[in-house]
Amino acid sequence: MIALIQRVKRASVSVDNTIVGKIDQGLLVLLGIEREDNIEKMVKLATKVINYRVFSDEDGKMNLNLAQVGGQLLVVSQFTLAADTGKGLRPSFSCAATPEQADRLYLAFVEYCRQQGVMTQTGQFGADMQVELVNDGPVTFNLQV
């Protein structure tokens, strides 16, 4: 399971020119789910995302997590993160989860974050989405479990 997280001042995701998810300060999470992923991996990654210290403290050091800054999450499914790009000039998605498995784990990730008290918005699983964001930094991390 892969989470490409970006610290943002604000972000939104639209489907058919309609905003379906929108946050202010927080993290945009592009979530890629692979065939070998399961609930245990989801909990581990969601916990890491929520607690990852990527926000600056009073000394300008990345030392604060999402809750400590009152941040929000915008979680967007992105199966292309599971691509194998090692060979040739075309990505292979053989490592990506099936749509059914990915949807189940995506929804579980979102629900887990909400249960932890994090205000969490989402995109629409499987849809063609447009994501807009204002990067803060930019600060981007690729987290994997």
UniProtKB/Swiss-Prot annotation:
State the organism named in the record.
Shewanella frigidimarina (strain NCIMB 400)
Enzymatic reactions: glycyl-tRNA(Ala) + H2O = tRNA(Ala) + glycine + H(+); a D-aminoacyl-tRNA + H2O = a tRNA + a D-alpha-amino acid + H(+)
Q: How does it assemble?
A: Homodimer.
Q: Where is this motif: Gly-cisPro motif, important for rejection of L-amino acids?
A: 137-138
Q: Gene for this protein?
A: dtd
> What PANTHER family does its record include?
D-AMINOACYL-TRNA DEACYLASE 1 (PTHR10472:SF5), D-TYROSYL-TRNA TYR DEACYLASE (PTHR10472)
Chief subcellular location equals cytoplasm
This protein's record includes keyword tRNA-binding: yes
Query: What are the UniProt keywords, alphabetically?
Result: Cytoplasm, Hydrolase, RNA-binding, tRNA-binding
From the Swiss-Prot or TrEMBL record, give the protein name: D-aminoacyl-tRNA deacylase
- Enzyme Commission number, as recorded: 3.1.1.96
Q: Which domain of life does the protein's organism represent? A: Bacteria
Kindly list the places in or outside the cell where this protein is found, as annotated in its UniProt entry. Answer: Cytoplasm
Read off the lineage from the record.
Bacteria, Pseudomonadati, Pseudomonadota, Gammaproteobacteria, Alteromonadales
